[in-house]
Design a protein with these regions (language model features):
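Flexible, glycine-rich loop/tail regions that form catalytic "lids" or insertion modules at the edges
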Residues: 77, 83-474
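Ligand-binding clefts of soluble mixed alpha/beta catalytic domains
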Residues: 5-9, 20-22, 70
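Short, solvent-exposed loop/turn segments at the edges of secondary structure
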Residues: 10-11, 36, 43-44, 72-74, ...
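Hydrophobic/aromatic ligand-binding patch that stacks against planar heteroaromatic rings
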Residues: 5, 40, 69, 237, ...
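Conserved phosphate-handling catalytic cores of large alpha/beta enzymes
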Residues: 25-34, 40-78, 82-88, 96
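Interdomain boundary/hinge elements
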Residues: 13-14, 351
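Short hydrophobic alpha-helical runs that function as membrane-insertion/retention elements
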Residues: 14-15, 41, 47-52, 383, ...
């Protein structure tokens, strides 16, 4: 489904299916409702080739056709290679227990290397002796490599032994502060861009009034800046510094809560205008996409994107944080553990709108506790941000540190436009990300006899409760 979508196209993917016609012990009749396992590709009109795995020359011919198709049309193509599994699913599996009829045939079936050697000998390409020699050399090479591996102790592996692999070694996690402040000039340049609309561009009146004009007034007044403005400042400043930004998710262009509006629409012509693409001719690329409704597929794609483009700020946003459960496999198998398993770090950012705002049980919790349970050995960062400026700094810190770690952010909902949750100019130009913030409402710390550690929306709820109770010692 993603193959022809803007923001998710690859220019065509060649899908190779090594079809053993069995899954552990499950036969096709129990595994799917379609005739072929590749029938799902029909939904995007991808050509599908079914080829006999016992005929390597035809497999090569089909592969060449598939490659030429992909290069010419930039679309997906599928090759379904019909094969069989000679042994069990693993070293301890005995397939005769569940498919005795099938494996009684396979047991006496000649090896492909034998039948193919006879085929090329009949064609006069190689003699039988030459074919046997090629096979012997290959087996000798494999045995030598296997013997070498057995000699090495896994516990004594050195970084040099990963040379040529995809492993990436990086510095350990550090709590050292990172300079993420920007100059007033940079802030003004980004603010000017996101509050400027081209002449004769007919912005929807309500958007002009509540977004463009309002942001313009906030900028002229010198703040305070809300969540959406702070995010735009983070994106824009990174773009000016040479860092590309990619944001992908359900309704991400507007923002589920209409707080972002990264794309303006002409109500007459339906033309689109991207303010963050028009800050400076020298800026880097800004990409923002509304995604299809498969969290699993899209987060997987964006995670891969973050691996291929490590210098990019790559963000996946859930429509509501609850929906991350649809992508739990990507989170568990890759985001939380890929660095430990394969030395493959990622700086993917996940924005998960979180908070009980009266929208029902499926739109309230990003399951903060799940992500905290997955944290171990500095594998990722989980942040419940309290102020727009801290959101600004944590996004910029993601790029400016000397290592990569996934960043999980519990995004707010009610705080997006809250006057209480707004930041001053100096919070962007003379500050950094702080893991602990002072309570700015406390005038005399000596009178405090109780300290509560909290974050995010909880802080504002507690401040409100403290004011109502006229309590000054907490």
């Amino acid at each position: 489904n993603m193959s022809q979508l803007p923001g998710y196209r690859t220019g065509g993917t060649i899908h190779l299916v090594v079809n053993n016609q069995i899954g552990f012990t499950t036969l096709p009749a129990d595994a799917r409702s379609t005739r072929y396992c590749t029938d799902m590709a029909k939904m995007v009109d991808a050509p599908i080739f079914h080829v006999n795995g016992e005929d390597p020359l035809t497999v090569i011919e089909v592969a060449q056709i598939a490659l030429e198709f992909r290069q010419k049309f930039r679309r997906d193509v599928v090759i379904d290679i019909y094969c069989y599994r000679r042994h069990g699913h693993n070293e301890t599996d005995e397939p005769l227990f569940t498919q005795p009829d099938l494996y009684s045939i396979i047991k006496v079936h000649p090896l492909l290397s034998t039948t193919f050697a006879a085929q090329v000998s009949a064609l006069g390409t190689v003699t039988a002796d030459e074919a046997a020699g090629i096979k012997a050399k290959l087996l000798e090479k494999l045995e030598a490599a296997f013997s070498e591996v057995k000699k090495k102790s896994e516990s004594k592996k050195k970084k040099s032994e990963f040379a040529g692999s995809t492993a990436i070694f990086q510095p350990p996690y550090s709590h050292e502060p990172v300079n993420t402040a920007i100059t007033v000039a940079t802030l003004d340049k980004v603010a000017a861009a996101i509050t400027t609309v081209p002449e004769k561009f007919n912005v929807v009146p309500k958007i002009k009034r509540t977004v463009v004009d309002r942001r313009l007034q906030v900028w002229k007044d010198g703040g305070p800046y809300d969540w959406g403005f702070a995010e735009a400042l983070a994106f824009g400043s990174l773009l000016l510094e040479g860092t590309p930004v990619r944001l992908s998710g359900q309704d991400s262009r507007r923002g589920t809560f209409s707080h972002r509006n990264s794309v303006l629409y002409d109500e007459v012509t339906r033309d689109r205008y991207f303010p963050l693409k028009n800050i400076s001719p020298e800026q880097e690329t800004f990409c923002v996409y509304n995604s299809p409704l498969s969290e699993y597929a899209v987060l997987g794609f964006d995670y891969g994107y973050s691996m291929d483009f490590p210098s990019m700020l790559c963000i996946w946003e859930a429509q509501f944080g609850d929906f991350a459960n649809g992508a739990q496999i990507i989170i568990d198998q890759f985001i939380a553990s890929a660095e430990a398993k394969w030395r493959r770090p990622s700086s993917i950012v996940m924005l998960l709108p979180h908070g009980y705002e009266g929208q029902g049980p499926e739109h309230s919790s990003a399951r903060l506790e799940r992500f905290l349970q997955l944290c171990a050995e500095d594998n990722m960062q989980v942040c419940n941000i309290t102020t727009p400026a801290q959101y600004f700094h944590v996004l910029r810190r993601q790029i400016h540190r000397g290592y990569r770690k996934p960043l999980i952010i519990m995004s707010p909902k009610s705080l997006l436009r809250s006057e209480d949750a707004a930041s001053r100019v100096e919070d962007f130009t003379n500050a950094r990300f702080e893991e602990i913030l002072d309570d700015p409402t406390i005038k005399d710390p000596k009178k405090v006899n109780r300290v509560v550690f909290c974050s995010g929306k909880v802080y504002y709820d507690l401040v409100r409760g403290r004011e109502e109770a006229k309590q000054t010692a907490t």
